[in-house]
Amino acid sequence: MMSKLGVLLTICLLLFPHTAVPLDGDQHADQPAERLQDDISSEHHPMLNSIRRREQNQFMSFTSVKLRDSRGERCCGPTACMAGCRPCCG
């Protein structure tokens, strides 16, 4: 069974080699670095910008809770410890 599978695999690789797959007209296999330096980078991509904005807004609303502790100092709710705020103790 395994030898038949090996023969079949060999025949398929000989008939349809991987290098025979045509590339797109504007895509060159020997220039991958140029494809990585497209005009649309992850810093300026509109979809990623909206995600970043949403994350920043959630962080700002999470950390901008203005609570006062017993001494009158600003502090955040107890779940804000993850964001680096000092939680109010009562």
Swiss-Prot record:
Q: Which cysteines are joined by disulfide bonds?
A: C75-C89, C76-C85, C81-C88
Q: What's a Gene Ontology MF term here?
A: toxin activity
Q: Name the residue ranges with Basic and acidic residues bias.
A: 25-43
Q: Where is the signal peptide?
A: 1-22
Q: Which keywords describe this protein according to UniProt?
A: Amidation, Cleavage on pair of basic residues, Disulfide bond, Hydroxylation, Neurotoxin, Secreted, Signal, Toxin
Q: Where in the cell is it found?
A: Secreted
Residues that bear Cysteine amide: C89
**Span list, region Disordered:** 24-43
Using the record's annotations, give every residue carrying the modification 4-hydroxyproline: P87
Tissues where the protein occurs: Expressed by the venom duct.
Which residues lie in the propeptide? 23-74
Q: What is its main location?
A: secreted
Q: Which GO terms describe its cellular component?
A: extracellular region
A Pfam cross-reference name: Conotoxin
Domain comment (free text): The cysteine framework is III (CC-C-C-CC). Classified in the M-2 branch, since 2 residues stand between the fourth and the fifth cysteine residues.
What is the similarity comment for this entry? Belongs to the conotoxin M superfamily.
Official protein name in the record = Conotoxin TxMMSK-06
Report the source organism: Conus textile
